[in-house]
């Protein structure tokens, strides 16, 4: 499966026109930023303090599942600081010279945004350490016995790193971030507000009930909510005179095979495979990947997080296990052996703690 082909994929859409629309509906200030109240309040405080001292903001690490607004928040930081932002990604920075070219072109207090920062090569990461800590760049000139190292002073800048896999960051890199923010899945109410705002910007007639129906199937992810809004708009324009109501949204999303929990065919296939082929688990991640013909990282990074967060799957030392919630979702009888397992509410409480 190609992840970008999923309607409820949290990764970026490859369609150029939709990317332009995405940029149009992104908030550009903390005042417009919806959800993540703790992150928003903290960043507002840190930014005001840095501006009051006429300093650059501390280096900031933003992590969390795809589609929650890490890139948007990085751009907001630059906007609120009144500086420019230069964006790149970890895989693009193949050589130290690639990073050096970006760093030497920064103005004082500018923001350098590195997406997928966990994918930086070790040799590039080594160059980043003194740049972050001392605002200096170590460059090797010459080769062989004539090679020598010189230090270039850099203007004070803010590195904003974004990652979906904070655990893959090396300790030396993680320790150099003064601000660390985790983005959580959004509530349905916040997503409904985001959908309504996007519809207003795009000029779409949308009822509050329609926005809520889209929001509750968006897997707690703004990027998915906006993508569903565009597909429901297509349905409404062809079959409902362009007006999006609750019933129109329901019909459109059912046609698109997105159920009331935000699951699509891939989610249901994963759960049913665990139930039917592995007796509910435990099952190892490699066996599960082979059974559904998926890459291991796709299951870990794309499919699992939301299913775990919603209490349909548990990770145990012996492997993945479905909860009774998964059996109930498909109308299946709960095995008697699951009577020994924690109920879903207790499991979710344990996750929250």
Curated annotation (Swiss-Prot):
DNA binds at residues 296, 315, 320. Signal peptide: none annotated. The keyword 4Fe-4S does not apply. SMART domains: AAA. GO terms for cellular component: cytoplasm; Holliday junction resolvase complex. Residues 260-353 are annotated as: Head domain (RuvB-H). Mg(2+) binds at residue 71. Its EC number is 3.6.4.-. The keyword Nucleotide-binding applies. It is found in: Cytoplasm. It catalyses: ATP + H2O = ADP + phosphate + H(+). Disulfide bonds: none annotated. GO terms for biological process: DNA recombination; DNA repair. Residues 4-186 are annotated as: Large ATPase domain (RuvB-L). ATP binds at residues 25-26, 67, 70-72, 133-135, 176, 186, 223. It is an enzyme of class 3 (hydrolase). Residues 187-257 are annotated as: Small ATPAse domain (RuvB-S). PANTHER family: HOLLIDAY JUNCTION BRANCH MIGRATION COMPLEX SUBUNIT RUVB, PTHR42848. The RuvA-RuvB-RuvC complex processes Holliday junction (HJ) DNA during genetic recombination and DNA repair, while the RuvA-RuvB complex plays an important role in the rescue of blocked DNA replication forks via replication fork reversal (RFR). RuvA specifically binds to HJ cruciform DNA, conferring on it an open structure. The RuvB hexamer acts as an ATP-dependent pump, pulling dsDNA into and through the RuvAB complex. RuvB forms 2 homohexamers on either side of HJ DNA bound by 1 or 2 RuvA tetramers; 4 subunits per hexamer contact DNA at a time. Homohexamer. Forms an RuvA(8)-RuvB(12)-Holliday junction (HJ) complex. HJ DNA is sandwiched between 2 RuvA tetramers; dsDNA enters through RuvA and exits via RuvB. An RuvB hexamer assembles on each DNA strand where it exits the tetramer. Each RuvB hexamer is contacted by two RuvA subunits (via domain III) on 2 adjacent RuvB subunits; this complex drives branch migration. In the full resolvosome a probable DNA-RuvA(4)-RuvB(12)-RuvC(2) complex forms which resolves the HJ. This is Holliday junction branch migration complex subunit RuvB. The gene is ruvB.
């Amino acid at each position: 499966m190609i992840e970008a082909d999923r309607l409820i994929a949290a990764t970026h859409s490859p369609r150029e026109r939709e990317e332009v629309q995405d940029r149009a509906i992104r908030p550009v200030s903390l005042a417009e930023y919806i959800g993540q109240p703790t992150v928003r309040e903290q960043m507002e405080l840190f930014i005001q303090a840095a501006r009051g001292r006429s300093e650059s903001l501390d280096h900031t690490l933003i992590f969390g599942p795809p589609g929650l607004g890490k890139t948007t928040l990085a751009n907001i930081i630059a906007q609120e600081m009144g500086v420019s932002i230069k964006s790149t990604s970890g895989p693009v920075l193949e050589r130290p010279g690639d990073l050096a070219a970006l760093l030497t072109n920064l103005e004082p207090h500018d923001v350098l945004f590195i997406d997928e920062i966990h994918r930086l090569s070790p040799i590039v990461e080594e160059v980043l350490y003194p740049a972050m800590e001392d605002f200096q760049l170590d460059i090797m000139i010459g080769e062989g016995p004539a090679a020598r190292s010189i230090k270039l002073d850099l203007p004070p800048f803010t590195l904003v790193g974004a990652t979906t896999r904070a655990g893959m960051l090396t300790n030396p890199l993680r320790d150099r971030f003064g601000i660390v923010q985790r983005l959580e899945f959004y509530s349905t109410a916040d997503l409904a507000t985001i959908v309504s705002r996007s519809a207003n910007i795009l000029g779409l007639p949308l009822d509050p009930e329609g926005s809520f129906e889209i929001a509750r199937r968006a897997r707690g992810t703004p990027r998915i909510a906006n993508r569903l809004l565009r597909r429901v708009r297509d349905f409404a324009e062809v079959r409902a005179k362009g007006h999006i109501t609750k019933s129109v949204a329901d019909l459109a999303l059912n046609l698109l095979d997105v159920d009331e929990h935000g699951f699509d065919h891939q989610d249901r296939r994963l759960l049913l495979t665990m139930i039917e082929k592995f007796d509910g688990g435990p099952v190892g991640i490699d066996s599960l990947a082979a059974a559904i013909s998926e890459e291991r990282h796709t299951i870990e990074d794309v499919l699992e997080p939301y299913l775990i967060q919603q209490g349909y799957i548990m990770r145990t030392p012996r492997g993945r296990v479905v909860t009774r919630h998964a059996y109930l979702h498909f109308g299946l009888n709960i095995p008697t052996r699951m009577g020994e397992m924690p109920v879903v509410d207790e499991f979710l409480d344990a996750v929250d703690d």
